[in-house]
């Protein structure tokens, strides 16, 4: 499984839903959704500043990430979703050992 960082902002309707049901209920709903897709929630935080919610998820593959983005983004409760693949230091160690035949443009 791969780790992903998700950040998003709630729309006005999304904020109303969080205020009505509570933060714990939102976390539980996300954990249930991710579990049903074969993943786990490592971290779930509400944030102040650039993002309203920040999650670290373990997910099976990029197809699952796309499905989550389509479903959650299409529901109208969140906006400005950003997804990043997270790499461990050991994964970077392995990447550094991988030979890459790259030539810059014009060389």
Regions from the PLM with identified roles:
Residues 1-107:
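A compositional/biophysical signature of low hydrophobicity enriched in polar/charged and small residues
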């Amino acid at each position: 499984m791969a780790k992903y960082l998700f950040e998003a902002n709630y729309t006005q309707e999304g904020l109303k839903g969080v205020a009505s049901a509570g933060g714990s209920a939102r976390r539980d709903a996300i954990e249930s959704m991710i579990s049903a897709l074969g993943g786990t929630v490592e971290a779930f935080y509400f944030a102040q500043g650039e993002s309203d919610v920040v999650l670290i998820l373990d997910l099976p593959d990029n197809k699952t990430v796309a499905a989550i983005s389509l479903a959650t983004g299409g529901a109208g409760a969140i906006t400005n979703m950003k997804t990043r693949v997270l790499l461990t230091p050991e994964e970077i160690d392995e990447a550094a050992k991988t030979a890459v035949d790259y030539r810059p443009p014009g060389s």
